[in-house]
Design a protein with these regions (language model features):
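Glycine-rich beta->alpha junctions and the first turn(s) of the following alpha-helix
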Residues: 3-7, 11-12, 212-325, 441, ...
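N-terminal glycine-rich flavin-associated loop
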Residues: 90-116, 140-143
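A short, Trp-centered hydrophobic/proline-enriched beta-strand micro-motif
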Residues: 125-140
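A structural signal for short hydrophobic beta-strand segments in well-ordered beta-sheet cores
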Residues: 156-159
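A short core secondary-structure module
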Residues: 168-212
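Glycine-rich phosphate/cofactor-binding loops in nucleotide/flavin-utilizing enzymes
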Residues: 383-389, 412, 418-472
């Protein structure tokens, strides 16, 4: 690992703590109350504030116009901000789920186009936020596994027409849908065999035939809207097709089903460690709240912090934070050596990207990204050259981190409420909000049950020839 990454990560943590002090902590409970009073509230002011801080370009690689901070540092940032408010962190973090979807496709031309719009939005003060749409009314976790998607009730269909596709269907629970400028959308040519006909698109908000329904009245992370996206005879031209069997065949002979799974794995292997970091941030926030309460509250003339049962619970909570942090660090380490951003962290490449001035990327590198050869090369590097064991390592560790970190976060919130008693149930104490926020983390990015099965599939089953996964 390049040594400068450590310095860079410390810088990111310092920025996150400053943001917490100035924005997240003062607003967390206020915005939560506001969303209960006004269920149609959309966080435009928060999005604009995050844009002013540069958060929507911070982890976009410099070749695409972004600031180019190392990707693992985002997990540290996520932990910090989520310790104050997981919903606010999702307003920032879900944008990078779509960024991962763009880059993992290997479609350099389209990734450059969209990501440079994000950069332009930062400069102009008009945020260009991205969303990613996979979940459907009858298919959620199913769509993240090729072995399961054919069993789901898939309805979002892409029909081939001259010069593009017509999209019909609905996506649900799409984080930041209502406030996004572009959506990375996955649809299927044959809804009976979706695993072999996956197509990725980018759709601009306002496109004819694309509209928003309601956004969910959620239990937690209320400041981050979860939207219904409706597509009714929505035409998407060929130049906005991100991923398809036709594009895949240009750089690999592997079956489309396998390539689609590898594409999905690249995305979630990069983002699930971040969800773990969200969970550990909430776990840490709950620990800090319980510690403060125990240090300042007397029972029968004796500080709560001096009672052994409280000391044991606080030690357990602290242990949970440490273990979760190790889990997302290990998952990020796997990605750094074998996953989506491995090339960016090879020492010569990393220092080259740091040393080159902005104009070099704008004048020299940016035009190269429009070449078809560049997209073919990226496709080859992502989909044809990596070994299956690399994919299993990254995907397996990402799943372990995801379910470990989020489960530990739930435990810490429950323990904090036990320590704080009735005080922990009060809205102004903040811990009941943390418990509402953390529950969602066990569900999105693949339920924790699915992630346990994926961890078994990737890390255990290869050593047991008779083991079968997703066979029921």
């Amino acid at each position: 690992m390049p040594k400068h990454m450590v310095k860079e990560t410390r810088e990111v943590i310092a920025i996150a703590r400053k943001f917490n002090d100035e924005v997240a902590k003062p607003l967390a409970l206020k915005l939560d109350r506001l969303t209960h009073e006004d269920v149609d509230y959309l966080p435009w002011e928060l999005v604009e504030e995050a844009n002013r801080w540069g958060f929507y370009t911070m982890w976009i690689p410099k070749m695409f116009g972004g600031q180019g901070y190392n990707i693992p540092s985002m997990s540290c940032f996520s932990e910090e901000v989520a310790s104050a408010c997981a919903g606010m962190m999702n307003v920032i973090g879900v944008h990078y789920l779509a960024v991962a979807g763009l880059i993992a496709s290997g479609n350099a031309r389209l990734a450059k186009r969209i990501l440079r719009e994000v950069v332009a939005g930062e400069k102009s003060g008009k945020p260009c936020v991205l969303a990613l749409a996979t979940t459907e009314p009858g298919a959620g976790t199913d769509v993240e596994e090729s072995d399961l998607v054919d069993k789901g009730r898939i309805t979002c269909q892409a029909t081939r027409v001259e010069n593009g596709y017509i999209i019909n269907g609905t996506k649900v629970f799409i984080s930041m849908g209502h406030v996004s400028s572009w959506t990375v959308l996955y649809a299927y040519e044959d809804t009976r065999h979706p695993s072999e006909t996956t197509i990725g698109f980018v759709v601009k908000t306002g496109t004819k035939g694309f509209s928003f329904g309601s956004h969910e009245n959620k239990m937690g992370q209320r400041v981050c809207p979860a939207s219904v996206l409706i597509f009714e005879d929505c035409f998407i031209p060929d130049n906005l097709v991100l991923f398809s069997s036709g594009l895949v065949k240009k750089f690999t002979k592997s079956p489309v089903r396998d390539i689609a799974q590898r594409y999905i794995d690249y995305v979630v292997s990069a983002t699930r460690p971040g969800v773990c970091a969200f969970g550990i941030g909430v776990a840490r926030g709950a620990f800090e709240a319980a510690l403060h309460y125990a240090s300042s509250t007397e029972i029968n003339g004796r500080l709560l912090i001096n009672q052994e049962w409280v000391q044991c619970m606080l030690a357990e909570m602290h242990k949970n934070v440490i273990l979760g942090r190790l889990a997302y660090t290990e998952a990020n380490n796997a990605n750094s050596h074998r996953g989506l951003y491995r090339l960016l962290q090879i020492k010569p490449v990393y220092y080259y990207l740091k040393a080159m001035p902005r104009f070099w990327f704008d004048k020299v590198i940016a035009p190269v990204l429009d070449w078809e050869f560049t997209s073919r090369l990226m496709g080859k590097l992502y989909f044809d050259l990596p070994k299956p064991e690399d994919q299993r390592c990254c995907s397996g560790w990402a799943s372990v981190a995801k379910f470990a970190g989020t489960d530990l976060g739930v435990k810490n919130c429950q323990m904090a409420i036990e320590i704080m008693g009735q005080k922990g149930l009060r809205q102004d104490a903040g811990v009941e909000k943390m418990l509402r926020d953390i529950k969602l983390l066990q569900i999105y990015e693949g339920t924790n049950q699915l992630n346990r099965l994926n961890a078994f599939k990737c890390l255990i089953a290869p050593e047991v020839p008779q083991a079968k996964v997703f066979d029921e």
